[in-house]
Every structure is written in C-alpha cells, then in structure tokens.
Amino acid sequence: MGPQHLRLVQLFCLLGAISTLPRAGALLCYEATASRFRAVAFHNWKWLLMRNMVCKLQEGCEETLVFIETGTARGVVGFKGCSSSSSYPAQISYLVSPPGVSIASYSRVCRSYLCNNLTNLEPFVKLKASTPKSITSASCSCPTCVGEHMKDCLPNFVTTNSCPLAASTCYSSTLKFQAGFLNTTFLLMGCAREHNQLLADFHHIGSIKVTEVLNILEKSQIVGAASSRQDPAWGVVLGLLFAFRD
C-alpha cells in the first residue's frame, strides 16, 4: 500500500508539472518596453532584450517602436510582447511627416521563436535618409522639447528653434502611450503645420494605445525664446500635465 501511495503522489506531481509547460504550438517571444528621451542618437541607442514570455496559443510576437523628433530633440517609445493580431511584415512609415515635429513608427507581428528581436534604430535611419531636408525660416520660432514633463521638459531644458516654412505654427501636447507594462506620459512641443492633434487618426500604433491632449500655448511662449522659458504661462501647461496623469 505504501509504494502504491507513493507512485500515486508521484503521478500527481508529474501531471502538475506537465500542466505548467507551454502547450504545443505556443511561441516564446521577447518581452520589453522602451521609453527614452535623453541623448537618443541613431547609432548609440540599444533596446536591451532581457526577458521573454510564453504566449497563448495562436498568438504571435509583436514589436512596435515609435521614433519622435522635434528640432534637435528625439524620443523613443516601444513595446515587445505577445499579440493576437495576424502576422504582418515590418512596416516603417511616418505617422506625422516632417518638416517640424515628426513621428515615425516601426511595427511587425511574427510567428517564430523569439522573432521580435529588433535592438536598434536602423529602420528609422533608412527612413530619414530618404526624406528631403526642409528650409527654416527665422521669422517664426517655437519652444521645443520631447520627454517627461518633470524630467526632460522642465522650462530650463526647453529650447527654442526656428521653424520650417511649411511648419510655422507652435504645437504642444501631452501624449500617453500604453501597452502591457508600457505606460508612458510625455510632453511634445515644437513647430507644426497647425496646432491640432497630430495623432488624431492613430488611436493605436501596433498594440500601443495612444492618447493625445493639446496643451494651451500663450503668445509669450510662441514669440520670445528667453521669455517663453520663464513665463507664468508655463503654469497652464504644467497644470494640464498634472491633470492628465493617472
């Protein structure tokens, strides 16, 4: 009776161990997020892939990366993980084209072992190389920044850049990107064609949910470079940012 009882316990343990194994056909994908707004350069940014995850049956591996430029400032926000979407090849394009504030995205869903393995900004290097350069106009300048409002976009860190002829309106918004463990809220300011929502037609970029709220810009922020950094109107922008936070 003793040996039979022991074998029964061993059987239950074995069944329990089997139940925790990934089912046949389940993919292993990289799991990662990216959110960086300082010192982002095309050839020195690396997406570290430290973790992976087992997906549900029929799910694929997704990687979506968003590259933002405004003046000389750059930001990168990204997501890697499992996705229920159908597979699609790498798609790289401008969601908001230059001149002025530009937002580009790279996204794909694949279905092979750890296939969501992009680690650099090479797709955006090629995209930018094919984009004609714009002509700037000294008659209009705007406060410029991209980053977290209490870190990268405090008034002392905001620069003022001359605007291109085709993008001579000052733009400011608070953006929130959410997907899996990604939950990033940041400020985006710069020159644009008009002060409307730039991502109004993009509620999702891949699996990343996008929320955009326009900020109020006072005339003093638009006209003067030095005065715009320290003007009380900054309180309006920061007030909206705090209201936007969860």
Swiss-Prot record:
Is Cell cycle tagged as a keyword?
A: no
Cleaved propeptide residues: 226-246
State the membrane topology.
Answer: Lipid-anchor; GPI-anchor
Q: Where in the cell is it found?
A: Cell membrane
List the source organism. Homo sapiens (Human)
The record lists glycosylation at 117
Report the CDD domains cross-referenced here: TFP_LU_ECD_LYPD4_rpt1 (cd23621), TFP_LU_ECD_LYPD4_rpt2 (cd23635)
Residue spans crossing the bilayer: none
Q: Which GO terms describe its cellular component?
A: extracellular region; plasma membrane; plasma membrane raft; side of membrane
Q: Which residues form the signal peptide?
A: 1-26
Q: Which UniProt keywords apply?
A: Cell membrane, Glycoprotein, GPI-anchor, Lipoprotein, Membrane, Repeat, Signal
Q: Which PANTHER family match?
A: CD177 ANTIGEN
Q: What is this protein called?
A: Ly6/PLAUR domain-containing protein 4
Q: Where is the UPAR/Ly6 domain?
A: 142-223
Ligase is among the record's keywords: no
Could you tell me the superkingdom of the organism this chain comes from? Eukaryota
Q: Lipid (GPI-anchor amidated alanine) attached at which positions?
A: 225
